[in-house]
């Protein structure tokens, strides 16, 4: 045995070939009996019939692998093609000829050695690993063994290499692989049917063929899934069928897929060709009723008969009301798939009346009074039906159609009133959306035939339409004829021409017809629906109220409306008067305070009162910059006093200034006369106000002069008449503030003050007043020249007083100032901030400048103010 095994186990690379010297040893009876018993026992383990070697001489047993899982097999081979005539034993023993030493023996040659050699070969069963190659070259002498057979497993034609007795028949295999696979399948079928074990071991491509060809004892029980075509060796096959044929599926998944497939095929075969048109309204025939019921999720759960009755084709739907019989009768017998909830879909119901031919067809009017009443034959459980001119349509389907229509421009939705006109081109189904609004019948109520009514345009409808009982409770009543339709891009119906102009179905908004069911955004349905079209909703946008008090005066064409012009511009001609003048133009009440320089005291008092109110305004911040600016302007003594005063009183002073500025804001002349002018560049009269404030702080008279100085801001003359140096400084400030003032831009002495003056917010309002008071600037310039002188001395005190004068006229402007600067110490107005600071600085500088000659060049100052203001514009 050892020698035999030694020789019988050729190297791995030689296993596929017949060994050069096969083992030739005679097997004694004991070994033969042992082999037979062992083989039978193994076969019994795997459910095979017992093999009698003597009886099975004619059967070629080859390489029966005992263990289906392992590669160690007991090769039971018989030299079938060459039965040993010498010794019956040999023939009996021959099955045990250990040709398995080369497991890949050609099927036919149990012992491909010489026939006589079978006995000499030492026929001894040997356990060898059987890993046969796909093809085993048969021995040359075994010509008979080269029998071409069709492998019982892989169904390929090949040389017979293995054969297996299946009791009544013998299976031939082309290779040991096929033999093992077949044996394993047989074993699993008989012994492990409850396991889904090794189905993967079967060549998937052969499953369909295996069933008929694998003639195992229980082969009849081997089932192929009718859906996935796989052999599942389990007991869980699901039977399905109506009795004529039983389909078997390996799993519920396959069964469901099969049912879906059957249902799909049946519906495809039975659905009218127009079914697709419902999804695509552009189809011309859609109006003709070709829009058959869509298969919606509800359709799957509703018996086909019910579904059919529920949603006949739109055209037939119209007829359905007349004679629901056709649609109901068309219910098809259930499909073969008993489990399919939907049976074959009946052929489309005959279209009694193509709506395209006559959209107003009376049959529709014959329909029940309202869609509220379900069409005859529609089961109560069916989804709500929408009565359209094409007939009752399930709401889900109708919604889909509406969505498709919404996709189209609303114009082609089909004008309602023209749709009513059979001859109306709009009713022509060329544009699916156009035509009698499908919603018309839907709204139909006890009122006159809804078909005609929906056709009417909203304005054509009597005003009672909104409350028509025909409107289903879920539908919105049509809006009043004149009321703009919600979310409609079109004007109210009343605005629409009554002529044949096609009105988008949306115009049928509230009409019982609900045209294409109301503008899509307003479509009312019993269940939530995604609205495809955005509805424009007016959103109130708060508008800055900076200019609310006196937008006309506050806003100057120069764009200084955001820059409050200091009232100083106005005071330029007449410090009190100027402020009152702009203010008078805005409010006559302030006029007395501004009437004359003598009123400046009153104005200052009023301004002080207002100052407290406007301290929270831009004026406060503006004043603060003013004091630093004043120091920069080179008026340290006068300006420093005012600065401190301005800083402390600035709030009040600034408030007054703001009031003055707001008063003068309309006459906003962003002139670069002085440092005040610089301020004015950004803030117009506000800058002047600042200057006036500084001057006012110096002295009441100076304060008046300061307005004149402010006027100088307005008018370059004031600056010129004023101290040239200061005037130049003011010009610089103006340049800095406005950046557009070429005249004062050339004067760079005070550009730094512009950055200092971030109080443009206050001066925005001032500039507004200034623009109004610009004309007063010239007259005020002289007064402000005087006040400017005093302002240099008493910028804070005089300025505050002067500012009250300004504030009184600027009370209206004061409102601007409050809006502009909520806090006295904070400059809120963004634009005027830099300008106002500059304005304050110019005010400080302007005080001497204006005091020097604010009155000198009043007309020139005014002209210059106007010119600079135009430049700023």
Swiss-Prot record:
A zinc finger (FCS-type) spans 142-180, 216-256. Residues 460-485 have a biased composition (Pro residues). Keywords: Metal-binding, Repeat, Zinc, Zinc-finger. Residues 312-338, 571-603 have a biased composition (Low complexity). Transmembrane segments: none annotated. Residues 554-570 have a biased composition (Polar residues). One of its GO terms (cellular component) is nucleus. GO terms for molecular function: SUMO polymer binding; zinc ion binding. It comes from the Eukaryota. InterPro entries: RAI2/SOBP. Residues 1-26, 307-338, 413-485, 550-608, 742-766, 779-811 are annotated as: Disordered. Residues 1-14, 783-793 have a biased composition (Basic and acidic residues). One of its GO terms (biological process) is animal organ development. Implicated in development of the cochlea. PANTHER family: RETINOIC ACID-INDUCED PROTEIN 2 (PTHR23186), SINE OCULIS-BINDING PROTEIN HOMOLOG (PTHR23186:SF2). Belongs to the SOBP family. This is Sine oculis-binding protein homolog. It comes from Gallus gallus. The gene is SOBP.
């Amino acid at each position: 045995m050892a020698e035999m095994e030694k020789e019988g186990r050729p190297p791995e690379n030689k296993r596929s070939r017949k060994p050069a010297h096969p083992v030739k040893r005679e097997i004694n009876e004991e070994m033969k009996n042992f082999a037979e018993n062992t083989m039978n026992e193994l076969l019994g383990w795997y459910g095979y019939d017992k093999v009698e070697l003597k009886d099975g001489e004619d059967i070629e047993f080859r390489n029966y692998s005992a263990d289906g899982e392992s590669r160690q097999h007991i090769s039971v081979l018989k030299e079938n093609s060459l039965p040993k005539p010498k010794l019956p034993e040999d023939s009996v023993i021959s099955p045990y000829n250990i040709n398995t030493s080369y497991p890949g023996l050609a099927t036919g040659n149990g012992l491909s050695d010489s026939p006589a050699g079978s006995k000499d070969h030492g026929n001894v069963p040997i356990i060898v690993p059987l890993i046969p190659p796909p093809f085993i070259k048969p021995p040359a002498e075994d010509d008979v063994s080269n029998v071409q057979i069709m492998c019982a497993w892989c169904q390929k034609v090949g040389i017979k290499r293995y054969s297996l007795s299946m009791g009544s028949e013998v299976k031939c295999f082309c290779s040991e692989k096929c033999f093992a696979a077949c044996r394993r399948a047989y074993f699993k079928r008989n012994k492990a049917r409850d396991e889904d074990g090794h189905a993967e071991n079967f060549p998937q491509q052969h499953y369909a063929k295996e069933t008929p060809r694998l003639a195992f004892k229980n082969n009849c029980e081997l089932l192929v899934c009718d859906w996935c075509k796989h052999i599942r060796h389990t007991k869980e096959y699901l039977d399905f069928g109506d009795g004529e044929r039983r389909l078997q599926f390996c799993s519920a998944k396959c069964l469901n897929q099969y049912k879906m497939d059957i249902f799909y095929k049946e519906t495809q075969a039975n659905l009218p060709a127009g079914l697709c048109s419902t999804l695509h309204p552009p189809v011309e025939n859609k109006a003709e009723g070709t829009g058959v019921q869509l298969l919606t999720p509800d359709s799957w759960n509703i018996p086909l008969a019910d579904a059919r009755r529920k949603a006949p084709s739109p055209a037939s739907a119209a007829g359905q009301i007349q004679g629901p019989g056709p649609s109901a009768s068309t219910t098809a017998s259930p499909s073969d798939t008993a489990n399919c909830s939907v049976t074959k879909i009946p052929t489309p119901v005959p279209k009694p009346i193509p709506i395209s031919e006559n959209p107003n067809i009376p049959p529709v009017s014959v329909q029940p009074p309202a869609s509220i009443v379900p069409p005859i034959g529609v089961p109560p459980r069916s989804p709500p039906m929408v009565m359209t001119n094409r007939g009752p349509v399930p709401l889900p389907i109708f919604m889909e159609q509406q969505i498709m229509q919404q996709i189209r421009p609303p114009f082609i939705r089909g004008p309602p009133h023209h749709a009513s006109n059979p001859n109306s081109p709009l009713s022509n189904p060329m544009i699916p959306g156009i035509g009698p609004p499908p919603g018309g019948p839907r709204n139909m109520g006890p009122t006159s035939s809804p078909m005609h009514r929906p056709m009417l345009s909203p304005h054509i409808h009597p005003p009672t339409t909104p409350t028509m009982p025909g409107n289903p409770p879920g539908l919105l009543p049509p809006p009043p004829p004149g009321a703009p339709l919600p979310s409609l891009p079109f004007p109210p119906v009343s605005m629409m021409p009554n002529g044949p102009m096609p009105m988008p179905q949306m115009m049928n908004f509230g009409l019982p017809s609900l045209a294409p069911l109301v503008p899509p955004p307003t479509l009312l349905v019993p269940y939530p629906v995604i609205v495809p079209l955005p509805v424009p909703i007016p959103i109130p946008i708060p508008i800055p109220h900076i200019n609310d008090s006196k937008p006309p005066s506050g806003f100057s064409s120069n764009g200084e409306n955001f820059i409050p012009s200091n009232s100083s511009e106005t005071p330029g001609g007449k410090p009190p008067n100027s402020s009152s003048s702009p203010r008078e133009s805005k409010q006559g009440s302030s006029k007395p305070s501004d009437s004359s320089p003598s009123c400046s005291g009153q104005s200052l008092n009023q301004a002080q009162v207002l100052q407290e109110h406007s301290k929270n305004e831009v004026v406060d911040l503006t004043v603060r910059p003013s004091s630093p600016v004043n120091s920069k302007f080179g008026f340290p003594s006068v300006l420093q006093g005012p600065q401190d005063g301005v800083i402390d009183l600035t709030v009040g002073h600034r408030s007054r200034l703001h009031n003055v500025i707001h008063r003068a804001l309309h006459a906003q002349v962003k002139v670069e006369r002085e440092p005040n002018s610089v301020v004015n560049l950004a803030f117009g009269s506000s800058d002047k106000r600042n200057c006036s404030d500084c001057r006012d702080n110096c002295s009441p008279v100076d304060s008046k002069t300061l307005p004149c100085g402010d006027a100088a801001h307005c008018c370059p003359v004031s600056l010129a008449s004023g101290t040239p140096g200061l005037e130049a400084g003011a010009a610089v400030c103006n340049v800095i503030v406005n950046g557009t003032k070429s005249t004062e831009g050339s004067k760079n002495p005070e550009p730094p003050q512009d950055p200092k003056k971030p109080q443009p917010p206050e001066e925005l309002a001032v500039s507004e007043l200034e623009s109004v008071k610009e004309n007063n600037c010239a007259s005020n310039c002289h007064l402000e020249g005087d006040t400017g002188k005093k302002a240099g001395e008493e910028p804070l005190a005089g300025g505050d007083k002067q500012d009250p004068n300004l504030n009184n006229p600027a009370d209206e402007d004061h409102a601007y100032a409050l809006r502009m600067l909520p806090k006295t110490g904070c400059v809120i107005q963004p634009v005027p901030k830099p300008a106002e600071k500059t304005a304050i600085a110019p005010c400080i500088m302007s005080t001497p400048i204006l005091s020097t000659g604010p009155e000198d060049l009043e007309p020139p100052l005014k002209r210059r103010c106007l010119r600079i203001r135009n430049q700023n514009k």
